[in-house]
Protein backbone atom coordinates (compact mmCIF):
# COMPACT_ATOMS: atom_id res chain seq x y z
CA UNK A 1 0.00 0.00 0.00
CA UNK A 2 1.30 3.47 -0.81
CA UNK A 3 2.37 5.57 2.15
CA UNK A 4 0.67 8.76 0.90
CA UNK A 5 -2.88 7.35 1.19
CA UNK A 6 -5.05 8.94 3.88
CA UNK A 7 -5.58 6.64 6.91
CA UNK A 8 -9.37 6.76 6.47
CA UNK A 9 -8.99 5.71 2.83
CA UNK A 10 -6.78 2.82 3.89
CA UNK A 11 -9.37 1.79 6.51
CA UNK A 12 -12.22 1.82 4.00
CA UNK A 13 -10.22 -0.26 1.53
CA UNK A 14 -9.19 -2.72 4.25
CA UNK A 15 -12.81 -3.12 5.37
CA UNK A 16 -13.89 -3.92 1.82
CA UNK A 17 -10.97 -6.29 1.41
CA UNK A 18 -12.19 -8.18 4.47
CA UNK A 19 -15.92 -8.16 3.68
CA UNK A 20 -15.98 -7.76 -0.11
CA UNK A 21 -19.22 -5.74 -0.03
CA UNK A 22 -20.59 -2.96 2.19
CA UNK A 23 -23.17 -0.21 1.85
CA UNK A 24 -22.41 3.48 2.31
CA UNK A 25 -24.49 3.37 5.50
CA UNK A 26 -22.48 0.47 6.94
CA UNK A 27 -19.16 2.13 6.18
CA UNK A 28 -20.40 5.37 7.74
CA UNK A 29 -21.40 3.59 10.96
CA UNK A 30 -18.13 1.69 11.14
CA UNK A 31 -16.10 4.91 11.00
CA UNK A 32 -18.54 7.24 12.81
CA UNK A 33 -16.43 7.40 15.98
CA UNK A 34 -13.83 9.35 14.01
CA UNK A 35 -16.19 12.29 13.51
CA UNK A 36 -17.95 14.78 15.75
CA UNK A 37 -21.50 13.82 14.88
CA UNK A 38 -23.65 11.69 12.61
CA UNK A 39 -24.15 14.37 9.97
CA UNK A 40 -20.42 14.94 9.68
CA UNK A 41 -19.80 11.20 9.46
CA UNK A 42 -22.29 10.81 6.61
CA UNK A 43 -20.89 13.77 4.69
CA UNK A 44 -17.23 12.88 5.17
CA UNK A 45 -17.64 9.17 4.45
CA UNK A 46 -19.55 9.94 1.26
CA UNK A 47 -16.78 12.29 0.20
CA UNK A 48 -14.07 9.68 0.87
CA UNK A 49 -15.98 6.99 -1.02
CA UNK A 50 -16.50 9.27 -4.00
CA UNK A 51 -12.80 10.09 -4.04
CA UNK A 52 -11.77 6.42 -3.92
CA UNK A 53 -14.28 5.73 -6.68
CA UNK A 54 -12.89 8.60 -8.75
CA UNK A 55 -9.39 7.14 -8.34
CA UNK A 56 -10.76 3.74 -9.50
CA UNK A 57 -10.00 1.91 -6.24
CA UNK A 58 -13.71 1.13 -5.73
CA UNK A 59 -16.65 -0.06 -7.79
CA UNK A 60 -20.18 1.03 -6.90
CA UNK A 61 -23.00 -1.42 -7.52
CA UNK A 62 -26.42 0.19 -7.78
CA UNK A 63 -28.90 -2.53 -6.91
CA UNK A 64 -32.38 -2.61 -5.53
CA UNK A 65 -32.23 -5.06 -2.64
CA UNK A 66 -35.14 -5.54 -0.27
CA UNK A 67 -34.31 -5.27 3.42
CA UNK A 68 -31.46 -2.79 2.97
CA UNK A 69 -32.63 0.79 3.56
CA UNK A 70 -36.24 -0.10 2.84
CA UNK A 71 -35.53 -1.80 -0.46
CA UNK A 72 -34.54 1.45 -2.12
CA UNK A 73 -31.59 1.78 -4.44
CA UNK A 74 -28.55 1.15 -2.25
CA UNK A 75 -24.96 2.10 -2.99
CA UNK A 76 -22.98 -1.09 -2.48
CA UNK A 77 -19.22 -0.73 -2.58
CA UNK A 78 -16.55 -3.27 -3.43
CA UNK A 79 -12.91 -3.20 -4.45
CA UNK A 80 -12.05 -2.72 -8.10
CA UNK A 81 -9.25 -4.64 -9.76
CA UNK A 82 -6.99 -1.65 -9.03
CA UNK A 83 -8.07 -1.70 -5.37
CA UNK A 84 -7.38 -5.42 -5.01
CA UNK A 85 -3.97 -5.10 -6.64
CA UNK A 86 -3.16 -2.05 -4.51
CA UNK A 87 -3.76 -4.02 -1.31
CA UNK A 88 -2.36 -7.40 -2.35
CA UNK A 89 0.40 -6.46 -4.74
CA UNK A 90 -0.84 -9.21 -7.06
CA UNK A 91 -2.32 -9.18 -10.53
CA UNK A 92 -5.74 -10.75 -9.92
CA UNK A 93 -8.74 -9.34 -11.77
CA UNK A 94 -12.13 -9.04 -10.09
CA UNK A 95 -15.62 -9.14 -11.59
CA UNK A 96 -17.92 -7.81 -8.85
CA UNK A 97 -20.99 -7.57 -11.10
CA UNK A 98 -21.06 -11.36 -11.54
CA UNK A 99 -22.24 -12.13 -7.99
CA UNK A 100 -25.82 -13.18 -7.37
CA UNK A 101 -28.28 -11.24 -5.22
CA UNK A 102 -28.29 -14.15 -2.75
CA UNK A 103 -24.54 -13.90 -2.34
CA UNK A 104 -24.78 -10.12 -1.91
CA UNK A 105 -27.51 -10.51 0.71
CA UNK A 106 -25.35 -12.83 2.78
CA UNK A 107 -22.20 -10.74 2.37
CA UNK A 108 -24.03 -7.59 3.45
CA UNK A 109 -25.54 -9.43 6.42
CA UNK A 110 -22.07 -10.49 7.57
CA UNK A 111 -20.86 -6.90 7.19
CA UNK A 112 -23.89 -5.71 9.16
CA UNK A 113 -23.01 -8.15 11.92
CA UNK A 114 -19.47 -6.81 12.11
CA UNK A 115 -20.70 -3.20 12.22
CA UNK A 116 -23.31 -3.95 14.90
CA UNK A 117 -20.73 -5.74 17.06
CA UNK A 118 -18.44 -2.71 16.92
CA UNK A 119 -21.30 -0.33 17.72
CA UNK A 120 -22.31 -2.42 20.73
CA UNK A 121 -18.72 -2.72 21.95
CA UNK A 122 -18.34 1.05 21.90
CA UNK A 123 -21.73 1.54 23.57
CA UNK A 124 -21.00 -0.87 26.44
CA UNK A 125 -17.26 -0.12 26.72
CA UNK A 126 -16.11 -3.59 25.74
CA UNK A 127 -12.97 -4.57 23.89
CA UNK A 128 -13.79 -6.41 20.68
CA UNK A 129 -11.72 -8.53 18.33
CA UNK A 130 -13.35 -9.86 15.15
CA UNK A 131 -11.92 -12.39 12.73
CA UNK A 132 -13.38 -12.54 9.23
CA UNK A 133 -13.12 -15.28 6.62
CA UNK A 134 -10.78 -17.02 6.03
CA UNK A 135 -9.00 -16.03 9.27
CA UNK A 136 -11.91 -17.31 11.39
CA UNK A 137 -11.81 -20.75 9.76
CA UNK A 138 -10.53 -23.64 11.85
CA UNK A 139 -8.78 -26.81 10.70
CA UNK A 140 -8.78 -30.07 12.63
CA UNK A 141 -8.52 -33.81 12.07
CA UNK A 142 -11.51 -36.10 12.14
CA UNK A 143 -11.53 -39.53 13.74
CA UNK A 144 -9.85 -41.03 10.67
CA UNK A 145 -7.05 -38.46 10.50
CA UNK A 146 -8.53 -36.53 7.58
CA UNK A 147 -8.20 -32.74 7.63
CA UNK A 148 -11.49 -30.84 7.97
CA UNK A 149 -12.04 -27.09 7.73
CA UNK A 150 -14.81 -25.52 9.80
CA UNK A 151 -15.98 -22.27 8.21
CA UNK A 152 -17.82 -19.83 10.48
CA UNK A 153 -18.85 -16.50 9.00
CA UNK A 154 -17.10 -14.63 11.82
CA UNK A 155 -15.29 -15.25 15.08
CA UNK A 156 -15.51 -12.66 17.85
CA UNK A 157 -13.94 -12.12 21.25
CA UNK A 158 -15.63 -9.70 23.68
CA UNK A 159 -13.60 -8.64 26.71
CA UNK A 160 -15.13 -6.90 29.72
CA UNK A 161 -13.66 -5.95 33.08
CA UNK A 162 -14.08 -9.43 34.54
CA UNK A 163 -14.71 -11.81 31.66
CA UNK A 164 -13.87 -12.87 28.11
CA UNK A 165 -16.59 -14.24 25.83
CA UNK A 166 -15.66 -16.03 22.61
CA UNK A 167 -18.01 -16.76 19.72
CA UNK A 168 -18.24 -18.48 16.39
CA UNK A 169 -20.97 -16.70 14.43
CA UNK A 170 -23.15 -18.15 11.68
CA UNK A 171 -25.18 -15.52 9.83
CA UNK A 172 -28.44 -17.16 8.75
CA UNK A 173 -30.66 -15.54 6.11
CA UNK A 174 -33.62 -17.96 6.43
CA UNK A 175 -32.73 -19.48 3.08
CA UNK A 176 -31.80 -23.01 4.20
CA UNK A 177 -33.75 -25.92 5.57
CA UNK A 178 -33.24 -26.34 9.35
CA UNK A 179 -31.79 -29.78 8.61
CA UNK A 180 -28.75 -28.10 7.03
CA UNK A 181 -28.36 -25.95 10.13
CA UNK A 182 -28.32 -29.10 12.27
CA UNK A 183 -25.68 -30.63 10.00
CA UNK A 184 -23.50 -27.58 10.60
CA UNK A 185 -24.12 -27.88 14.35
CA UNK A 186 -22.72 -31.41 14.27
CA UNK A 187 -19.62 -30.08 12.52
CA UNK A 188 -19.10 -27.65 15.39
CA UNK A 189 -19.50 -30.46 17.90
CA UNK A 190 -16.95 -32.52 15.98
CA UNK A 191 -14.54 -29.57 16.10
CA UNK A 192 -15.15 -29.10 19.82
CA UNK A 193 -14.42 -32.76 20.47
CA UNK A 194 -11.09 -32.46 18.63
CA UNK A 195 -9.87 -30.17 21.42
CA UNK A 196 -7.92 -27.96 19.00
CA UNK A 197 -9.61 -24.72 20.00
CA UNK A 198 -9.41 -25.46 23.72
CA UNK A 199 -5.66 -26.11 23.48
CA UNK A 200 -5.19 -22.68 21.88
CA UNK A 201 -7.77 -20.59 23.76
CA UNK A 202 -8.53 -22.53 26.93
CA UNK A 203 -12.27 -22.73 26.23
CA UNK A 204 -14.49 -23.51 23.28
CA UNK A 205 -16.46 -20.54 21.89
CA UNK A 206 -20.24 -20.40 22.01
CA UNK A 207 -21.73 -20.98 18.56
CA UNK A 208 -24.16 -18.20 17.67
CA UNK A 209 -26.80 -18.62 15.00
CA UNK A 210 -27.73 -15.06 14.04
CA UNK A 211 -31.13 -15.04 12.35
CA UNK A 212 -33.21 -12.28 10.70
CA UNK A 213 -36.44 -12.51 12.72
CA UNK A 214 -38.19 -14.09 15.69
CA UNK A 215 -40.02 -16.86 13.82
CA UNK A 216 -36.74 -18.12 12.36
CA UNK A 217 -35.21 -17.94 15.83
CA UNK A 218 -37.92 -20.21 17.22
CA UNK A 219 -37.59 -22.58 14.27
CA UNK A 220 -33.81 -23.01 14.66
CA UNK A 221 -33.92 -23.14 18.46
CA UNK A 222 -36.58 -25.87 18.30
CA UNK A 223 -34.58 -27.86 15.75
CA UNK A 224 -31.46 -27.75 17.94
CA UNK A 225 -33.39 -28.65 21.10
CA UNK A 226 -35.02 -31.60 19.31
CA UNK A 227 -31.77 -33.08 17.98
CA UNK A 228 -30.61 -35.97 20.22
CA UNK A 229 -26.95 -35.77 21.19
CA UNK A 230 -26.36 -32.09 20.53
CA UNK A 231 -25.22 -30.23 23.67
CA UNK A 232 -27.79 -27.47 23.92
CA UNK A 233 -25.51 -25.13 25.88
CA UNK A 234 -23.05 -24.98 22.97
CA UNK A 235 -25.48 -23.11 20.71
CA UNK A 236 -27.24 -19.76 21.01
CA UNK A 237 -29.86 -18.50 18.57
CA UNK A 238 -30.43 -14.75 18.46
CA UNK A 239 -31.78 -12.11 16.10
CA UNK A 240 -29.86 -9.19 14.66
CA UNK A 241 -32.01 -6.89 16.80
CA UNK A 242 -30.75 -8.71 19.92
CA UNK A 243 -27.08 -8.85 18.93
CA UNK A 244 -26.11 -5.90 21.14
CA UNK A 245 -27.37 -7.85 24.17
CA UNK A 246 -24.92 -10.64 23.35
CA UNK A 247 -22.09 -8.12 23.64
CA UNK A 248 -23.47 -6.67 26.87
CA UNK A 249 -24.66 -9.80 28.68
CA UNK A 250 -23.06 -12.81 27.02
CA UNK A 251 -24.91 -15.79 25.52
CA UNK A 252 -28.44 -16.39 26.76
CA UNK A 253 -30.09 -19.83 26.86
CA UNK A 254 -32.46 -20.58 24.00
CA UNK A 255 -36.10 -20.30 24.89
Report each predicted region and the residues it spans.
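Nuclease-adjacent, charged terminal/linker segments that flank catalytic cores
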Residues: 1-97
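Non-catalytic C-terminal interaction segments of nucleic acid-processing enzymes
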Residues: 13, 175-183, 193-255
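Hydrophobic, Leu/Ile/Phe/Ala-enriched alpha-helical segments that form helix-helix packing faces
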Residues: 31, 49-53, 113-121, 188-196, ...
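Active-site metal-binding core of divalent-cation-utilizing nuclease and nuclease-like domains
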Residues: 61, 103, 122-167, 176-186
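Short, flexible loop/turn elements at secondary-structure junctions
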Residues: 81, 134-136, 158, 173, ...
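Amphipathic alpha-helical dimerization/coiled-coil segments
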Residues: 85-131
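Core beta-strand-centered patch of the WYL/Sm-like small regulatory domain
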Residues: 104-111, 115, 119, 162-198, ...
Amino acid sequence: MTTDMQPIHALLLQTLQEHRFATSHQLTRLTMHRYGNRRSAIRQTSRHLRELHRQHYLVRLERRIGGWQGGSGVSIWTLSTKGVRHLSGGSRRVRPHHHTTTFLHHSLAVTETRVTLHEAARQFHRDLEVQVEPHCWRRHLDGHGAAITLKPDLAATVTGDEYVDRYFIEVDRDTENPARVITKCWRYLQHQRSGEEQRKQGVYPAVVWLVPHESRKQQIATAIASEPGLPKDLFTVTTMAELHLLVRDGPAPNT
